[in-house]
Amino acid sequence: MLMVISPAKSLDFTAPDQVLPLTTPELKPQIAELAKVTRKLTAADLRRLMHISEKLAALNHERFQHFDPQVEEGLQAVIAFNGDVYAGLNARELDRPALEWAQDHLRILSGLYGVLRPFDALQAYRLEMGARLKTKRGANLYDFWGETIAKTLNAAGKDHADPTLVNLASQEYFGAVDAKALKLPVVTCHFKEEKGNTLRVLGFFAKKARGRMARFAIDNRIDKAEGLKGFNLDGYEYRADLSTPADWVFARLQP
């Protein structure tokens, strides 16, 4: 079983309390190609591209000027990302054996890096997958990555006892996984809140629940997707009546 999650816009480069290995991102040629493109962008370009403030545009312009794909330094990706998904995952509290298990069973999708393993060295950046960044390969990052992300996931999951790819990513990021090139069976998890007679997905809760699901799998060393149906953290439970073989629904009473 292989899980995929989205990255986060916010980052925390505070060093973890424990010494952890640092691995090299797998898609260095593509990362270098994108780095050349982003280095040429002005702060104003970045502001328009990602609809961000002048302050954030200036920060990320500076980041891209100093970004060097050939330098193997940074912080472990699963530690550095700091959004809602990662609040649910809380990787800083995982011990090394748990993180080593995650290195084999968890992948982070990224606009700049394509696919990251938990220990992969991350340098500070912001480049959303939905950004319409023009490259020699096309009009946006979906064109740029093409089949690459899917093929990388195929290689990561093919030798697992259960090759199922568990989608815990957003539509923006999972959209970069070419469905025709992907050879792994896919299960997408949906997290819904019940209020009155209505079930709905609420962004903040859903993001945190995706991280909690990944943490549940890591803590319990779940290597077959079927085991995820036992997820019961924060009041969620699997709803067979709302699920299909490819889409699993977990619901709870809205807090």
Swiss-Prot record:
Database matches in InterPro entries: YaaA (IPR005583)
Family to which the UniProt record says this protein belongs: Belongs to the UPF0246 family.
HAMAP family named in the record: UPF0246
Name the UniProt record assigns to this protein: UPF0246 protein Caul_4480
Pfam family, one: H2O2_YaaD
Lineage: Bacteria, Pseudomonadati, Pseudomonadota, Alphaproteobacteria, Caulobacterales
Organism of provenance: Caulobacter sp. (strain K31)
GO CC terms: cytosol
GO biological process: response to hydroperoxide
